[in-house]
Amino acid sequence: MEVIQSFTIDHTHLKPGIYVSREDKGFTTFDLRITEPNQEPAVAPAAMHSLEHLMATWFRNSEAKDDVVYVGPMGCLTGMYIIMTGAYTVEDMQRLTIECLQWILTQTEVPATRPEACGNYLLHDLPMCKWESRRYLNRLQHDFHCEYTQLQVTLEDGMVFADA
């Protein structure tokens, strides 16, 4: 089996920011990296779940709503994936994400936290979601990263493999 693209990123040098994870068939997958993998704690599951509800709500009501395909958390809980159609850049996503995070900080409740609307409606933490949002907002505004450090593998025979 081939190694999937996201596993070729050197997570030991990955900083919080926004990255293009992949582009294919007219879709762009953006990696919204909230925490520094393996250096900082992952986002707590309840806070991440709230962040997912809030970000999905905002993006699906934003100027980009017709281009939003998917908004959801990474399994490692260090960030979110947003899949878009159209010609969005990391700078476009930076602007949109900053607007989204600013909106999240004004919210007093998490949307769709009822048993009929959410499969785990009790797993939410708005205060911690806002804490993570504030920290990520600061990083996007003052310490923006958008280029992956690729993992390179060199075999014993000298052959080098790296994600391009």
Place the predicted regions along the sequence by residue:
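Generic structural motif
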Residues: 18-20, 68-73
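A domain-level signal for the structural core that forms small-molecule/cofactor-binding pockets
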Residues: 58, 118, 161
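Active/ligand-binding-proximal structured segments within catalytic/core domains
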Residues: 27-60, 70-71
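Short secondary-structure junctions
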Residues: 62-65
